[in-house]
Amino acid sequence: MIKLRLKRFGKKKEASFRIVACNSTSRRDGRPLQELGFYNPRTKETRLDTEALRTRLTQGAQPTDVVRTLLEKGGLLEKTERPSIAIGKAKLEKEKLAKAKTKDEENDNSKVESEGNEAES
C-alpha cells in the first residue's frame, strides 16, 4: 500500500519535512517513491506538487493524518470529520456512571411494579 507521509530532514530541533509517497512498510526517512511537497512547521510554509498529489490520490495512496490536514488546507481534499480514536478516561467513567444510574432506575421501577402486582393479588 502506498502512503503519503512526512519525511523528516534538517538540523536537530529545526526539523522540516518533505511530503513523500512511499511504501507503507518502508522506514520514515528511507528512499521514497516520489517527493510531492515540502512543509516547514516553524514558518508554516507549505509547497505542494498538486498534479503529482492528485495522481497519487487517484491511484489509491492513503495520506496520514498530518498530510491529510495539509492537503485539506491546500484545497486538494475536502474537509472530513474524523472520529476521535482515543476517548479520555474521565469520559469513559462518566458514561459508565450514567449507564449504572439508568440500570438502577430501571431496577427500582421494576421492583415497585412487582410489589404493586403482589399487593393486588
Curated annotation (Swiss-Prot):
Organism superkingdom: Bacteria
Gene3D superfamilies: 3.30.1320.10
Region annotation Disordered: where it falls in the sequence: 97-121
UniProt keyword Zinc, yes or no: no
Residue ranges with Basic and acidic residues bias: 97-114
Biological processes per GO annotation: translation
Record-linked PROSITE patterns: RIBOSOMAL_S16 (PS00732)
Keywords: Ribonucleoprotein, Ribosomal protein
GO molecular function: structural constituent of ribosome
Pfam families according to UniProt: Ribosomal_S16
One of the record's GO cellular component terms: cytoplasm
SUPFAM superfamilies in alphabetical order: Ribosomal protein S16 (SSF54565)
Family to which this protein belongs: Belongs to the bacterial ribosomal protein bS16 family.
Protein name per UniProt: Small ribosomal subunit protein bS16
Provenance organism: Prochlorococcus marinus (strain AS9601)
